[in-house]
């Protein structure tokens, strides 16, 4: 099946702007496949796996981001979760940070191709950019263990941002390991959402640092 057909099957029925999200998310995945011929953006390119692990994983917890004026995706890679969330939440401004220049150029090109006026791409390291900029929410999928993440996002936390990190099924163990670092920095870590990916492709946990 095509990306669009897979997404039609697996995305939640109550997802905002669902049909438009499916069309644009499928186009995003097509662009990744095209670009992967020249340099590696992701190893996940089969329609079913990409639809689940890239798009569904990004948008299932969309309600946590709803109503936030400005969301920062720290280390966006090929545009996840930032681009799918921006499709679902067109009224929210998104800044996608990606320090690898080729990937940043790809995300910028993809956002332009999709007509995402609510997306800005910056070729910067998250920990540097966040020292001088503010955000309502900072999120990331491929991020360091929580022990390090507490320090990486220290400036954003001091500026009042809410940190929402996509984690796997062992988040509680990470939270326990990070307890002393969190106490030292006077922040709190907690699980705010859990969900299962379709096809038994894994359990996911959203951890909040605040």
From Swiss-Prot:
Entry superkingdom? Bacteria
Where located? Cytoplasm
Q: Which GO terms describe its molecular function?
A: rRNA (guanine-N7-)-methyltransferase activity
The cross-references to Pfam families, in alphabetical order and at most eight, read: GidB
GO CC, alphabetical: cytosol
Query: Any idea of its EC number?
Result: 2.1.1.-
Q: Which UniProt keywords apply?
A: Cytoplasm, Methyltransferase, rRNA processing, S-adenosyl-L-methionine, Transferase
Q: What is its main location?
A: cytoplasm
Q: Where, in this chain's numbering, is S-adenosyl-L-methionine bound?
A: 75, 80, 98-100, 126-127, 141
Of which family is this protein a member?
A: Belongs to the methyltransferase superfamily. RNA methyltransferase RsmG family.
Function, in words: Specifically methylates the N7 position of a guanine in 16S rRNA.
Name of the protein in its database record: Ribosomal RNA small subunit methyltransferase G
| Organism this protein belongs to | Solibacter usitatus (strain Ellin6076)
The primary gene name is rsmG
């Amino acid at each position: 099946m095509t990306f669009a057909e897979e997404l039609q099957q697996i995305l939640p029925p109550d997802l905002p702007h669902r049909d438009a999200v499916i069309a644009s998310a499928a186009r995003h995945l097509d662009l990744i496949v095209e670009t992967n011929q020249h340099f590696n953006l992701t190893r996940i390119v089969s329609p079913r796996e990409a639809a689940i692990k890239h798009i569904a994983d990004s948008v299932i917890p969309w309600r946590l981001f709803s109503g936030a004026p400005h969301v920062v995706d720290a280390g966006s890679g090929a545009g996840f979760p930032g681009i799918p969330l921006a499709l679902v939440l067109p009224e929210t401004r998104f800044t996608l940070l990606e320090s690898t220049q080729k990937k940043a150029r790809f995300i910028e090109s993809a956002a332009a191709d999709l007509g995402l006026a609510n997306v800005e791409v910056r070729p910067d390291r998250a920990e540097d950019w966040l020292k001088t900029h503010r955000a309502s929410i900072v999120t990331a999928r491929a991020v360091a263990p929580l022990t390090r993440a507490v320090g990486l996002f220290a400036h954003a936390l001091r500026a009042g941002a809410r940190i929402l990190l996509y984690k796997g099924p062992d988040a509680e163990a990470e939270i326990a390991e990070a307890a002393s670092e969190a106490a030292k920095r006077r922040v709190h870590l907690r699980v705010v959402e859990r969900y299962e990916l379709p096809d038994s492709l894994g359990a996911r946990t959203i951890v909040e640092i605040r």
